[in-house]
C-alpha cells in the first residue's frame, strides 16, 4: 500500500516508519509512506503557511496556495486511483468497518490540517472524503492520520505475522475482544481460566466467543444492536447473562 501525507510536521511520521508493526511493514516494502510539507511550496522568505480567515475571529487558517500545491504534488505521485482524505472532526467517524473499506485502496493521500483548519474550497475541490477519529479536538491532523495508517496497515496482507491476529482483534467481527492471559498461571491470587489450560480447542473457541459477546454487552451494548447474531452466539450470550445473575 502507498500512503502520501501532506503535513507541516513530517518528522512526526517517523513514529510510523521507524517503529512497530508499521515500521516492519515499511522495511519489508509492504507499506510505502511519503510526506509533503506545504512549507516547501511557499514563495516568500518566511515560508508562511497560515493566513487570516475572512469574517474575522480568532485563529488562522492554512494558507491556500502552499497547501493546494502540496496536495497536487502528492496526488501526482500517487496516481489517478488515489483517494484524498482530510482528517477532520467533521468527518465520518473511523470504525473497523471504515478501516476495512480504506484498506481496499492501493493508495491514499492524507491531508493533515493545522491551526483552525483549511479553506472550505480546498475540501470541496481536492478532498474525496473526510474522516474523524472521535468527537474531540486535537492540535492537528497528524495523530489522526497516524491512527488511520496504523489501523489500515494491519489489514494489508503480510503486515502481521499471522492474519488471524487481525481477524481476532476487537471490532473485527463487530464485537469487543475477549480477555487474554499469559504466564504465570496465578498472579496475585487471580488464576487463568481453567478452560484456557484444558487444551480443548472447541471449548476455548466457545469461551472466547462468549467472553467477547459478554464484554460487548457490558461495555458497548450499542454495538450489538447492529449485529445479526447466530444461534450459537445468542445461546452463549444468554448463558453469559445467566451467569452474571447467578453471581449477583
Swiss-Prot record:
CDD domains (UniProt xref): TrmD-like (cd18080)
EC number: 2.1.1.228
Reactions the enzyme catalyzes: guanosine(37) in tRNA + S-adenosyl-L-methionine = N(1)-methylguanosine(37) in tRNA + S-adenosyl-L-homocysteine + H(+)
Disulfide-linked positions: none
Subcellular location: Cytoplasm
Keyword Metal-binding attributed: no
GO molecular function, one term: tRNA (guanine(37)-N1)-methyltransferase activity
Top-level taxon: Bacteria
Main location: cytoplasm
One GO term of the biological process aspect: tRNA N1-guanine methylation
Keyword annotations: Cytoplasm, Methyltransferase, S-adenosyl-L-methionine, Transferase, tRNA processing
Cellular component GO terms, alphabetical: cytosol
Enzyme class: transferase
Residues that coordinate or bind S-adenosyl-L-methionine: 113, 133-138
Keyword Methyltransferase: yes
Pfam families noted in UniProt: tRNA_m1G_MT (PF01746)
Family: Belongs to the RNA methyltransferase TrmD family.
General function of this protein: Specifically methylates guanosine-37 in various tRNAs.
Oligomeric form and interacting partners: Homodimer.
Name of this protein: tRNA (guanine-N(1)-)-methyltransferase
